[in-house]
Amino acid sequence: MKLRPLHDRIIVKRLEGEEKTAGGLFIPDTAKEKPQKGEVIAVGNGKKNDEGKCAPLDVKVGDSILFGKYAGTEVKVDGDEFLMMREDDVLAVIEK
């Protein structure tokens, strides 16, 4: 991928949602909700603070994250779909 986000933006690849319910029923693609978790693919160089210095981001490439339902902007690059969002849209980092 040849995308480099600017400032405090990050690029996220959604993690696939559940294919079936807890009861064992398969969920068709049209009924699935888009997952609200993903993997960070790329990060910007940081956000400028009050002193004009660039503060590094808390999230790193490879982090699994949770984000809000309406967070980010969907972009398509080379046939792959990604979300571009600000670090402020990230709700939590999933610890492994």
Swiss-Prot record:
Q: Which GO terms describe its cellular component?
A: cytoplasm
Please give the CDD domains that the UniProt record associates with this protein.
cpn10 (cd00320)
> What GO annotations for molecular function exist for this entry?
ATP binding; metal ion binding; protein folding chaperone; protein-folding chaperone binding; unfolded protein binding
The yes or no answer to whether the keyword Chaperone is present is yes
Q: What does the UniProt keyword field contain?
A: Chaperone, Cytoplasm
Q: Which domain of life is it from?
A: Bacteria
Q: Which GO terms describe its biological process?
A: chaperone cofactor-dependent protein refolding
Q: Where is this protein localized, as stated in its record?
A: Cytoplasm
Q: Which family does it belong to?
A: Belongs to the GroES chaperonin family.
Subunit-level organization: Heptamer of 7 subunits arranged in a ring. Interacts with the chaperonin GroEL.
Q: What does this protein do?
A: Together with the chaperonin GroEL, plays an essential role in assisting protein folding. The GroEL-GroES system forms a nano-cage that allows encapsulation of the non-native substrate proteins and provides a physical environment optimized to promote and accelerate protein folding. GroES binds to the apical surface of the GroEL ring, thereby capping the opening of the GroEL channel.
- Which protein is depicted? Co-chaperonin GroES
From what organism does this protein derive? Trichlorobacter lovleyi (strain ATCC BAA-1151 / DSM 17278 / SZ)
